[in-house]
Amino acid sequence: MARVFNFSAGPSMLPESVLSRAAAEIMDYHGSGQSVMEMSHRSKVFEEIMDEAQNLFRSVLSVPDNYDILFLQGGASTQFAAIPLNLLNGSGKADYMLTGQFSTKAYKEACKYGDIRVVASSKDKTFSYIPEVTRDDFDPEADYAYICLNNTIYGTKFPYIPDTGDVPLVADVSSCFLSEPLDVSKFGIVYGGAQKNVAPAGLTIVIVRKDLVGKSRDITPAMLDYKNMADNDSMYNTPPCWSIYMCKLVLEWIEKLGGLEEMKKRNEAKAKILYDFIDSSKMFSNPVRHCDRSLMNVTFVTGSDELNAKFVSEAAEAGFVNLKGHRSVGGMRASIYNAMPVEGVEQLVDFMKEFEKNN
C-alpha cells in the first residue's frame, strides 16, 4: 500500500529517509550485532548515541552552555507537575497565560503546589487569539511565568516572546519544537514531547537553565527532580532508548537540510499554501486571528457538522488521514509538521478545491 499523508497532531509523520535508515539499522546497529531496541542503556554504544543526540540538539537549536538538556519520559503532561515542584521555591507564586487546553491543564496542576495566577487568557473567544501582555502584567516576585508557545488544538502560536523581566519564562513547545529558530536564552525552561517534530512517542525533552536546577521541593519524586536527572545524564533509570536514537536521526536530517532557518522557510511556505486557499474559499474558513496563526496546526471548518464529517471521511479515502479536529472543538485540523512534504499540502489543497466544487 502507498504511504498516506498523515496530518495527525501527534504522533506525526517522520521523514522517509529517517525511517529508511532506521529500518536498515534495526537488526544490526553499526556492527554491534544488535538493535538499539535491545541494547543496554549502559553500554558504550548506546552512551555514544545519547551523547550524539544531546550534542546535536544543542547545536541545531543553539542551546547555550548554561542550560542542561534532559531526555526524560512521561510526556509533556508530567512536566505540568515537575515544573512547579522544581521552581516554586521562593515566593511560591507563578503566573500563567491560558491560551488553550494544555496551558489550562498545566495551570490546574500547578495550583496544587502554590499560589498560581492567571495573568491573561483567550478563553473568552474560544482560544482563537494570543493575548497581548507587557512586563507590567507579570508579578516580579513570581518564581516563574508560563506559556504554551504553540497551541495544537486551536491552531494558534505566540507571535512574540513575553517580556517577564527577571522572572524565568517557561514554555511548552511540544508542537513547534525544531520548526524554526528559537532564542533559548530568553527562557528559563523550554520543554516538550517529542512525538510531533522530533521523534516517536516516548521521549520528553527539557532544556533548563542551570541556575534553576537543584532547588526542588523535598516532596519532589526522584523521577521529576531536574538535578537528579542532570546528575545522572538523563539515565537515573532506563531511558527511552529507541526514541532517543530516532531523535538523533531526525536532528541529523534537519542539519543536512540546512538547519532551523531552512526548516522555517519550508514550514512558512507550506502554511501559506494552505492558509491562502482557506482565506479565498467560500466553503472553508479559519477562526484564528491572522497574526496568531500557527505554522504547524491549521484549523478549519465548513460551517456544517455534516459537511465536516463528509470531508474527513472522503479525505481519508483519498489518502489524507487524521484531519478530524480535536474532539473538544470539532471541525478539521491539518498538522503540517517538519516531516510533511510540501507535496502533501499541495495535494490536500487540490482535494479541498474539488470537495468545495462538488458540495
Regions found by a protein language model. Give the residues of each.
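PLP-dependent enzyme catalytic core of the Aspartate aminotransferase-like
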Residues: 2-4, 317, 330-359
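A glycine-/small-polar-enriched, mobile loop at the entrance of the PLP active site in fold-type I
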Residues: 3-54
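Active-site phosphate-binding strand-loop segment of PLP-dependent enzymes
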Residues: 10, 110, 121-177
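Conserved N-terminal alpha-helix of the aminotransferase class I/II PLP-enzyme fold
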Residues: 33-79, 86, 101, 109
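PLP-dependent aminotransferase-like
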Residues: 77-145
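Conserved active-site segment immediately N-terminal to the catalytic lysine
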Residues: 170, 184-195
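Active-site C-terminal subdomain of aminotransferase-like
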Residues: 194-275, 289, 358-359
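Conserved PLP-binding catalytic core of the aspartate aminotransferase-like
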Residues: 284-315
